[in-house]
Amino acid sequence: MRFKNRLFWIAAFIAFFVDQLTKYWVVQTFSLGETLPILPGIFHFTYVTNTGAAFSLFSGKVEWLRWLSLGVSLLLIGLALLGPVLERWDQLGYGLILGGAMGNGIDRFALGYVVDFLDFRLINFAVFNMADSFISIGIVCLLLASLQKSPDSHHRSR
C-alpha cells in the first residue's frame, strides 16, 4: 500500500514539531511575562499564556476550544486517511492546519492554556505562537488552492 497524501503528513509533523519545540524553549528560557526585544519596539519574544484561540480571540473559553482542536484534528486526519488524494496546495494547507491544531490542542488539554511568545509591537498585535502561524499559513495555502481550481463553467463553450 502506498502512503497517501504524503505532503499532508510531512507538513503536519513539521508544524507540530516546530510549534512544540519553540514553546518548550520559551517555557525553559523565560519567566512568565518576560520579554526579549529582538527588534526593539517592533518585534519581541514575550512569554504569555492564552486561554483563548488564535491571537487571543475567545479568551477564557479553553474548555470548548480544546474539544474544537481535537475535532478539527480528527476531521483532518480522517480526510487524509479516508478521503481522496489531495492536490499539493490542499495537502500543504490541511497539514499545516493539523499541525497547528494539534500543537495548541495538546497545550489546552495538558496545561489548560496555550503558550504564546511572538510579539509584533509595531502593529500592536496580539501575542501568538507558531501553531497560530501555521494555521494562518495553512488557510492561505487553501485559498491559493481554490484560486488555482477553475470552475467547470469556464470550460464550457459559449
Swiss-Prot record:
Catalytic activity as recorded in UniProt: Release of signal peptides from bacterial membrane prolipoproteins. Hydrolyzes -Xaa-Yaa-Zaa-|-(S,diacylglyceryl)Cys-, in which Xaa is hydrophobic (preferably Leu), and Yaa (Ala or Ser) and Zaa (Gly or Ala) have small, neutral side chains
Annotated pathway: Protein modification; lipoprotein biosynthesis (signal peptide cleavage)
Membrane topology: Multi-pass membrane protein
Catalytic site positions: 116, 132
Listed PROSITE patterns: SPASE_II (PS00855)
Location (main, coarse): membrane
Key words of the record: Aspartyl protease, Cell inner membrane, Cell membrane, Hydrolase, Membrane, Protease, Transmembrane, Transmembrane helix
One Gene Ontology CC term in the entry: plasma membrane
Similarity comment: family membership: Belongs to the peptidase A8 family.
Protein known as: Lipoprotein signal peptidase
Organism, as annotated: Trichormus variabilis (strain ATCC 29413 / PCC 7937) (Anabaena variabilis)
